[in-house]
Structure formats: C-alpha cells, structure tokens
Amino acid sequence: MSKEIAKKRIEELRDLLNTFNYQYHVLDNPSVSDAEYDRNMQELIKLEAENPEFMSEDSPSVRVGGTVLDIFEKVTHKSPMLSLGNAFNEGDLRDFDRRVRQGIDDANVRYICELKIDGLAVSLHYEKGRFIQGATRGDGVTGEDITQNLKTIKAIPLRLNEEVTLEARGEAYMPKRSFVKLNEEKEQNGEDVFANPRNAAAGSIRQLDPKIAAKRNLSMFVYGLANVEEKTIPSHSESLDFLGELGFKTNPNRRTCETIEEVIAYVEEWQEKRPHLDYEIDGIVIKVDDVALQESLGTTAKSPRWAIAYKFPAEEVVTRLTGIELSVGRTGVVTPTAELEPVRVAGTIVRRASLHNEDLIREKDIRIGDYVVVKKAGDIIPEVVNVIFDKRTGEEEEYHMPTHCPACESELVRLEEEVALRCINPTCPAQIREGLIHFVSRNAMNIDGLGERVITQLFDADYIRTFADLYSLTKEQLLQLERFGEKSATNLVQAIENSKENSLERLLFGLGIRHVGAKAARTFAEHFETMDALVKATEEELKTINEIGEKMAQSVVAYFDNEDVLELLQQFKEYGVNMTYKGIKIADLQNVESYFAGKTVVLTGKLEVMGRSEAKKKIEALGGKVTGSVSKSTDLVVAGEAAGSKLAQAEKHNVEVWNEERFLQELNK
C-alpha cells in the first residue's frame, strides 16, 4: 500500500470510528456491532504502526491507552472548581428561592435542574477544537493531569465539531453494569472489590497505566462551560445545548423550571426514578439559568448564591446486628463497631457500622440480635440509626464494654471529661500498629508505598515494632512478604531512605503526640529548630509560644519525659533521620530573594499546615503585601479549604491562584 493510499485510509477509518463512538457513547444509538467496530479499530492501529508519520494525538486509537506514567503532574485550574451549598429538604429549597428573588429584586427567574452525577469532577481543555488537557478537581484550585486516561473515555470527544477554544467541566462515572462486571472480575482474581461505582471511577481514572483505564468502560456527562473564547452565551441551558452541538455528552434529563414548585416536583420525580438509571446520582443541582442574573447574585464565602445541590436523603435499610467488635486506635481509644448481616446500602454491601462509644450503645439501647435501621452518613460512613423494638423476641443480649483492652489485656480507663474508654499501655500492639500507620502517612513522614496493608504485613511478620524499626528494613525482608517483587521492594526501601531528609515538623507530627496536629508541629519546629531543644523545653517555655495552650504544653512535656521516647530519638539519630527544621524562619526572610517581593497577595480559606496569620508574616517578611480583598492589582490568591467568594473574584480579575501545598513549596525554596 502506497503512503498516499495509507494516509487516505487512515483518515477514513478515523472519521468512521469517531462517528461510531459518537453514536454509541453520546447518542446511545449504536449503528454497528462490536465486532465491526473492533475490526476497524485494529485496521487503524495496524496502519498507524506501519505509518507512524501519520499518527495524530486525536486519533481514536489513543483510546486503547498509551505509555505508563511515572506520576500525575499538578495542574492549577484557570478558574477554581467551586463546591455548591446543600439543601436537604423542601424548606431548604424554598429558602434558596427566597434568597435568589431577594437578591435580584424579585425579577423573573428561571431555574435549570440537572441530575447530580455521583462520579469524579474533571475539567477538559480544548484548543481550536482539539482536546489538549484534562484534570481532576483536586482541592478546587489544583488538580492532577489525567489527560491520557481521559482520552480512553469514548464519550469525551478528542476533536470538537468546531475549532473553538474552551474549558468544559463534567463528571466522569462508571455505569452500574460496568461496575458489577468489574467487581465480578476482581472477585475471580482474588482482588479487593470497589465499594461503589464512584470509587471505581476515581480509582480507574487515577491509574498511572492508561490501558487499565481503557478497560474500565468509563463514561462522562459534561455539565458546564467554564470559559469559551470569542463567544457569549446568555444562559446555562443554552451553554449545555452548545456543548451538545460540539459533540459532548450532556445529560438528557435536565429541565428548566419557572417556579420553585416545579423544581420541587422535579426533585420528587427523580427521587423515585433514581434506582432505574444505569448510573449513580446523589441529588439534583438547581441553578439560576440566566448568566447575567448569576453574575448579579455573585457568591458567598463558601459557594455561589445562584446554585444549590439538593442531596437525596440517605437510604435507610433494616438488618440484624449479630455482634459487636472492638478496635483500638493509636491514642488508645477503644471503639465499638456493629457486626451486621450483610445488606446493600446506597450501592454497596455493608457488614459493619460504627457505634462510636459505650454511651451511644446505652442511649439507643442497642443489643446483640436486634434488628436495626442502618444508613450511610453523608452516603459514605455506615451508622446505626435506631433499634426496631417491635421486632425484639426477648433473646437479644445486652452488651457491656470490657474492662480490659482487647489487644493487650491492660485495664481500660475513662479520662476526665471523656466518653471514650482508653488503653493507656504504651506497648499495646494495636496502638503501635495504628501509630505506625499514622507515622508514614501523607502529612507525617509521607513514605510512598507504605500504607495500612503493608504496615500490617510488616507488623504481623514481626519486622517492625517501633518507628525506628522502619529504618532497619531490608529489601530481603520485604521480598518475603506477599505481593512484593524486586522492583516494589527496592522502591520502598528507597522511599524510606528518602524520608530521613524530611524537615522536623513532619517527624514531630508523625510521632503522634497527643493534642499536637500538623500546624502545632510546624510551630514547634520553627520555634525550637532542633528536636534536642524541644525535648529540653519546660511547660512554661512552651506556653509562651503563640497558640500553644496549657493542655498541649503539658502533653508535650509528658511525652518527652519518657525513657522509651528518648531511646527512640537516639535510634533516629543513629539511622540518620533528620531532626532539624529545614523551613525558613521569619527572621531569616529579610535577605532572601523571593517571588513574593513587591507582590500583592490575598489569603482565603483555612490553611491546614500554616495559619493565615503566620503566612501573612512570612509574605510580608519576603517583601510582599497581604490584603483582604481581590482586585485588579492583586498578583496572587492563596486558597485553603472552604475558600469561596475570593476565588470567584480571582477568576473575574484573572488572578493566579495557588493551593497551600504550592504556597509552602515556594516559601521553602
């Protein structure tokens, strides 16, 4: 076959396959059999392999998955992906309607209602009609680049019907039938199954190997247009029509409503129809349709005033409580958990539900053998709502919390002003295991590849009993464990070695000192600079530090007044674990060349690791100026959790937005 003929045939096959994809995955109206589709795809793949000079990034063949990635790159959203306020009942919806009408002086308002797809929010960027990048929502400010995985989703067009530059946003999801099939395959292979379709979709999209995502049969509904060049669209409903014309899959079940009564009727209708859909929904999104009215209403500190998400009530089911088991946390708290006859709740099989503490068991009069009502709090965490007393037979057994720890047999105590029972034995194996899991976690030593499963394996094999034991692990020991090969063992040993270089605040937080969170750990690290200096500090010295109270000061002094802890610190030294603060102190910032010099910065939302007052001091010490509002003169917005109206202002004025992680990286350069 000549090059000219091959090129022509490749173009024909691409057009044909794009048409097939659109008919099947967007219109839900397939025109060819799977076998015919596969034959055309295989022919295209073969021709492109033989003629690589004709390969194109938007070829349908890229949907089978490409090169395995090493890591997902971070992406800062051009405009933040904000969350919505919630409504839980008819009264909340009427309050929303009242606020909207007050905000626009009772002008005529039309709402658009859409199904709230329970999947993974993503953004899609197109340049002159070509798909160039896709990213997860992340924290709303910064997400992860998942372009290669999104290319495997056939409902996402790789080339639009117009050469337009835009950003669309939507929800990637896994159809119920695909979820059932995937879990059946996992069970047959002896693998852990996914809890629900949402987790399955999120887990599939975040695979470093796009070929895995390609096999998972994901789909996507686009629900909004974040921005589009050289085009003004007056309403949200028209923007959805426009997206459909471009080739996107939009949900066909949307409806415009002239009154709040029509909105409520739509909500009730889909609450009934919900089980019959082939995808999960967890509510209804209601928006003011007119874009000009949206801009007039603006946003609050947390969410837009022109939209709200109605959350369906948590599904409640009845099952039998067959027993109560106990778990011991890293701080020694003993928590009771209900063992249940397996029952499906909100799309997943539930076998256990939290009972929180002994007082709750007494308050609800929960007994072993009772029939109980179970729901998922926030559609996530199973909990026992109440007992069905009418079903009692008299054979149910009252439950009494033990007097001794289920893990080590030490006597349990209830500390003053606490409802929880605690094991205060420092050598309790359950506490040690949970403490190890905390030590390696993301905000602590952040050891990649060391999660709960591996820690449990190492603990059960008696390879680790203290934090310091992690630093004596060898590749040979890891190779003795299930699911470890040469590469994974080598990578984990290297990750543990890398963690030795962490700054002091990570080590302090990882130790799990009572009352000391990530923010306090950073405060101590910056103030004392070395572990030795902190160990020698008195309670009075600690209390002089801003935001350190008596309880925390006493806890820190008591922690270090322990021979076992001092021995642990000595072992850290011998293994070469860094115990000094590597961050920048405010006093040292005056002479540092900094990005922040001459910049105007706005801080918004809750900063987890560094408080806003501390962040303000550091920015000012680096020559920056911190203001309380966003304007055209603002250079940067640093956004923590629950950031709201200032993000919208940043978008309006085209101001760069960083999350806390990006901010800390710049500070520590």
Curated annotation (Swiss-Prot):
It catalyses: NAD(+) + (deoxyribonucleotide)n-3'-hydroxyl + 5'-phospho-(deoxyribonucleotide)m = (deoxyribonucleotide)n+m + AMP + beta-nicotinamide D-nucleotide. The keyword Magnesium applies. It holds the Pfam family HHH_5. Zn(2+) binds at C405, C408, C423, C428. Keywords: DNA damage, DNA repair, DNA replication, Ligase, Magnesium, Manganese, Metal-binding, NAD, Zinc. Its cofactor is Mg(2+); Mn(2+). It is an enzyme of class 6 (ligase). GO terms for cellular component: cytosol. GO terms for molecular function: DNA binding; DNA ligase (NAD+) activity; metal ion binding. Its EC number is 6.5.1.2. HAMAP family: DNA_ligase_A. DNA ligase that catalyzes the formation of phosphodiester linkages between 5'-phosphoryl and 3'-hydroxyl groups in double-stranded DNA using NAD as a coenzyme and as the energy source for the reaction. It is essential for DNA replication and repair of damaged DNA. This is DNA ligase. It comes from Bacillus cereus (strain ZK / E33L).
